[in-house]
Curated annotation (Swiss-Prot):
HAMAP family: Ribosomal_uL23_B. Belongs to the universal ribosomal protein uL23 family. InterPro entries: Nucleotide-bd_a/b_plait_sf, Ribosomal_uL23-like, Ribosomal_uL23/eL15/eS24_sf. GO terms for biological process: translation. One of the early assembly proteins it binds 23S rRNA. One of the proteins that surrounds the polypeptide exit tunnel on the outside of the ribosome. Forms the main docking site for trigger factor binding to the ribosome. Keywords: Ribonucleoprotein, Ribosomal protein, RNA-binding, rRNA-binding. It comes from the Bacteria. Part of the 50S ribosomal subunit. Contacts protein L29, and trigger factor when it is bound to the ribosome. GO terms for cellular component: ribonucleoprotein complex; ribosome. This is Large ribosomal subunit protein uL23. Pfam families: Ribosomal_L23. GO terms for molecular function: rRNA binding; structural constituent of ribosome.
């Protein structure tokens, strides 16, 4: 998966209450492609936003079972990346990519 473009690696910023609290510790949370690796995520964030990344932590949130009109379906799995930035660096996720 080394041929993924930077915009294909980072799907969207994850704006939640928990990610807002993490921003106080110089961390930003992104939804990323399922097959993206930590080095690819680091390279994409550094290239797109022009910041220095100290660490990347990833997690996969399993999709929930949902019922719609009596039919049982399943939401897709989502991979998230918690990116820790260097001191003095920041990303304004409200501006978008």
């Amino acid at each position: 998966m080394t041929d993924l473009r930077h915009y294909d690696v980072i799907v969207s910023p994850a704006i939640t209450e928990k990610s807002t609290m993490a921003s106080e510790q110089n961390q930003v949370v992104f939804n990323v492609a399922k097959k993206a690796s930590k080095p690819e995520i680091k390279a994409a964030v550094e290239a797109l936003f022009g910041v220095k990344v100290m660490a990347v932590n990833t997690l996969v949130r399993k999709g929930k079972i949902k019922r719609f009109r009596g039919t049982i379906g399943r939401q897709s799995d989502v991979k998230k990346a918690i990116v820790t930035l260097a001191d003095g660096q920041s990303i304004d996720v409200a501006t978008g990519l």
